[in-house]
Regions:
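Pre-Walker A-like glycine/lysine-rich segment at the N-terminus of P-loop NTPase domains
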Residues: 1-60
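Conserved beta-strand and immediately adjacent loop positions that scaffold enzyme active sites
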Residues: 4, 97, 121-123
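A generic structural motif
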Residues: 8-10, 99-103, 125-127
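Generic, ordered loop/turn and secondary-structure boundary motif
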Residues: 11-14, 22, 84, 120, ...
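A generic structural signal for short, non-catalytic loop/turn and secondary-structure boundary residues
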Residues: 12-14, 54, 91, 117, ...
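Glycine-rich loops and low-complexity Gly/Arg-rich segments
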Residues: 29-32, 42-47, 67-69, 122-125, ...
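Conserved P-loop NTP-binding catalytic core
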Residues: 36, 41-42, 55-116
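Electropositive, glycine-dotted interaction segments
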Residues: 107-140
């Protein structure tokens, strides 16, 4: 179950964007497995306001996690779309963070940053209690 999704430097978004499924504590429902989370959300806005780019960022993370990336295979490129309207951002890494509850009931945060050809860093943190446990971290 998705809690938060954050990304930066992807498609039409240069700055940090955050999407949260968390709801105010006064509105929590005890009838739901995760009472602090909304069971439904809507994404709406004017034409050309970034709705499709937001969904593309979420899809990119999903495919990156599912399919992975093999470095050093020919001229392989990571199919990310950095912000192109700023020459500095076009070459900067795109950053992503997903906070979620997994099927085991624990909360996890997975973060990574990629350029067109490399994974700059990757980190997975689990919350088996109130304290975070770093499961792995790798930097280039």
């Amino acid at each position: 179950m998705l809690l938060n999704f954050t990304f930066k430097n992807f498609a039409s978004f240069r700055d940090v964007q955050q999407f949260s499924m968390e709801i105010p504590s006064k509105e929590n429902s005890e009838q739901w497995k995760y009472p602090e989370l909304s069971t439904v959300t809507a994404l709406y806005g004017a034409n050309a306001s970034g709705k499709s780019s937001f969904l593309a960022a979420l899809w990119f993370v999903s495919s990156f996690v599912r399919d992975g990336y093999v470095s050093g295979v020919g001229e392989s490129e990571i199919p990310r779309r950095g912000f192109l309207l700023d020459h500095l951002s076009a070459t900067d890494a795109s950053e992503f963070s997903i906070e979620m509850y997994a099927e085991d009931g624990y909360r996890y945060i997975y973060e990574f940053a990629v350029t067109d050809t490399t994974v700059e860093y990757e980190e997975l943190t689990a919350y088996y209690s109130r304290r975070p446990s770093l499961l792995y971290s790798r930097n280039l």
